[in-house]
Design a protein with these regions (language model features):
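Phosphate/diphosphate-binding loops
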Residues: 187, 205, 210-213, 225-227, ...
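Flexible glycine/proline-rich, aromatic-decorated loop/lid segments
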Residues: 319-323, 361-375, 383-410, 415, ...
């Protein structure tokens, strides 16, 4: 593009006049700095202006030229978020024309909760630093947790291995090769005792990332506490218990959706009666994003699942204000800092509206979208792994600026395996540096009122409502999942993202740009080759030392409850107290409920 073409471009964009002399001066500045000469030796011909240089010329010209009413329409090159939301070069007050800050923004801790769920947010206390951890044996995970607590972690978060997630004991043939690999292996109440050894369960909160077998793990946790003389009413924590996203994004489901929803709502009712301070679900967008969704899809599909859980609980006989205050959410913090901040703010505002208008909630606590955040695991790269420290820092910062209640920062080595102790410590220190050194905790919602952030928040929300309307038209989240709608949308988004990385239009430093060819040595977390055999021996002894007839009778009560309408967690707890294993309880429900196989 020549100077005449550049001036014409600006004129066509809606400017009443174009000061060509000022523009020529800006162009001359670039020539004087040698930038155009360098460009001419590259792929742009003589007399042509490269896009980056054109961008600098426009920026310098704008500093000299009075602002026009159409300034926001000028772009040297079009920019969009991964959702396709256009990003302008400059945002002004005109981009928020007609926008009512009292209605759309409000005050922190008050409707519509855009600015946060609590009036003082981090001025009151920092977010909970809850580092996700779990691997190998219960003893090994217990030691890692104690290390994290000693280094300043303020909450626990447990990762379970795949057999535990899928309801198989460690000696089951289908567990072979997976025991303790991606999380801790928990089969029995003895395992849970070892996992929680020496931890003050009445003083800390524990989050458990578990879904199909959520009820079993929660009950084992409760039984251990009771064995120590700690009443269930003093226990605090969160159970993920979000089975719908398993059908959409992860795949660790066991039973058909509708039977799984019964387990979810039975857990709601059980906790309301017996474990009142426990968050009964963590409605999860994290895994939806990890599967390849966009930020808008993450919001829309997660809130759609949330609507389905509320509807199911009401259908099960619970009043909305009896359970909704214990609902929580779990989001991903991805790479685009401002889009992520907008996502968190939009989701909070949308949920308050859903609970008020759709479900008639009157307790303000029922309207609060309280959430945990984890930095985006899928963004980490095996190439130049130290770069991941920077990625994690920016992602964690977006979660804090977006008002998270708790946060996990990934280890920089998680693209190649479980985090080493060093990587876990660096991740925790990342959170502590943000909290103690950056100043972001000093004022609530520091980005409020930004022309860009508020415009982006509005755009994310508007597009998410469009998705929710489509899902409602399909009959709700369960019907949309059964029809494959969410899965198809995520697949298309994931393909588009991968294609952009492949063709270089989406830059990933160290992967498709700034590749130096140097292989950086990296310590890899070692797995225990003796664990699987050792777990099998433990299970053999465990079964031999218990009252087999008592276990069988207790499991029959679980089966009878599954055939009826009784809350399943009551007989499940009795069976686990009789020393039934996780796999045995799950097998009873497999026989009664069947297992789910997706169509096609």
């Amino acid at each position: 593009m020549s100077i005449g073409g550049l001036a014409g471009y600006l004129g066509a964009a809606g400017f009443d006049q174009v000061d060509r002399k000022t523009l020529a001066d800006a162009l001359g500045h670039e020539v004087a700095r040698g930038r155009l000469r360098r460009v001419e030796r590259g792929r742009y011909g003589r007399g042509e202006i490269a896009p980056r240089t054109r961008y600098r010329i426009l920026a310098r010209w704008r500093r000299s030229f009075p602002l026009s009413r159409n300034l926001t329409t000028v772009d040297a090159d079009e920019r969009r978020t991964d959702d396709g939301i256009p990003v302008q070069t400059v945002y002004t007050a005109q981009d928020l024309a007609g926008w009512d800050p009292e209605k759309r923004l409000g005050q922190p801790g008050k409707p519509p909760y855009t600015r946060g769920v609590y009036p003082t947010m981090y001025r009151g206390r920092p977010w909970t630093m809850r580092q996700y951890s779990g691997f190998g044996s219960a003893d090994a995970t217990n030691q890692r947790w104690k290390m994290l607590l000693a280094n300043g972690s303020t909450g626990l978060s447990c990762a379970f291995d795949l057999p535990t997630q899928m309801g198989y004991d460690s000696d089951h043939p289908r567990a072979e090769g997976e025991v303790g690999k991606v999380g801790v292996a928990i089969d029995t109440i003895d395992d849970m005792h070892r996992l929680l050894d020496g931890l003050p369960l009445d003083q800390i909160t524990t989050s458990m990332t578990i879904n199909s077998t959520a009820a079993v793990l929660l009950l084992l946790y409760q039984l251990v506490a009771e064995d120590r003389g700690i009443p269930a009413g003093k226990l605090g924590g969160t159970i993920q218990n979000d089975i719908l996203k398993e059908y959409v994004a992860r795949g660790t489901y066991i039973y058909p959706p509708r039977q799984s929803m019964r387990l979810v709502t039975d857990l709601f009712g059980y906790c309301r009666q017996y474990v009142p301070n426990w968050n009964t679900i963590s409605i999860s967008g994290y895994h939806i994003r990890e599967a390849g969704s966009t930020a808008v899809q993450e919001v829309a599909f997660t809130l759609a699942n949330g609507i389905a859980y509320v509807e199911a609980a009401i259908e099960a006989g619970l009043a909305v204000d009896e359970f909704a205050s214990r609902l929580s959410f779990f989001w991903n913090a991805h790479n685009n800092l401002f889009e992520e901040v907008a996502k968190f703010r939009a989701a909070r505002r949308m949920w308050a509206r859903i609970m008020t208008e759709r479900f008639g909630a009157t307790d303000e606590r029922s309207k609060l979208l309280r959430f945990h955040t984890q930095t985006g695991g899928s963004t980490l790269t095996a190439q130049q792994p130290e770069n991941n420290v920077v990625r994690v820092t920016l992602q964690a910062l977006s979660a804090v600026l977006g008002g998270t209640q708790s946060l996990h920062a990934n280890g920089f080595d998680e693209a190649v395996g479980l985090p080493t102790e060093r990587a876990a410590r660096v991740a925790l220190r990342t959170q502590q540096i943000i909290a103690a050194e950056s100043g972001v905790v000093d004022t609530v919602d520091p980005l409020a009122g930004s022309y860009f952030v508020e415009s982006l928040t509005e755009a994310v929300e508007a597009r998410a409502w469009e998705y929710l309307d489509k899902i409602d038209g399909l009959g709700g989240a369960v019907a949309a999942i059964e029809a494959g709608f969410m899965q198809d949308e995520i697949e298309r988004a994931a393909f588009a993202y991968a294609q952009a990385v492949d063709d270089g239009s989406k830059v990933v430093v160290g992967v498709n740009a700034y590749v130096d060819g140097e292989v950086q040595p990296l310590d890899v977390f070692p797995s225990d080759p003796t664990l699987e055999a050792g777990k099998a021996e433990q299970l053999t002894r465990f079964r031999a030392e218990r009252d087999a007839a008592g276990v069988d009778a207790a499991l029959e009560q679980v089966a009878a409850a599954a055939r009826g309408t009784q809350n399943l967690l009551v007989p499940m707890k009795a069976a686990l107290a009789c020393r039934a294993t996780l796999g045995e309880v799950s097998d009873v429900l497999r026989r009664e409920f069947g297992t789910y196989r997706p169509a096609g």
